[in-house]
Amino acid sequence: MSLSDEAVYKINNTSYEQMVNDLAKPGQAIVDGMNAKAAHILHMSIGIAGEAGELLDAIKKHVIYGKDLDVENVIEELGDLEFYMEGLRAVLSLSRKEILMANKVKLLGKRYASGTYSDEQAKGRADKE
């Protein structure tokens, strides 16, 4: 079924822009409800997303465009990711060891119970059921 341009931009006589305005939480409400801890969590999470994007860009240039891998940049971006992840762990009172152990339990206990990778287990994703 194909929708006309008008149908795409008008749903229940509301423009898409108006729908977004109606459904998105207002910025002031977010700010008003944010304490210092929440602001720090947001800051660290945004940092992780940004640095992950920069790392992905470096990898994209190598894999997609055939450029030499800029290992120095990869090291820098991985270091930046560690910085933000440590900040997030700290504000949440979590240790790196605790997180790595939980991930190991998830991978070996649910996803890859055999202890080795297989396409079948990866597709099954028992940890996501």
Task: Identify what each model region corresponds to.
Residues 1-129:
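Flexible "arm" and connector segments at domain edges
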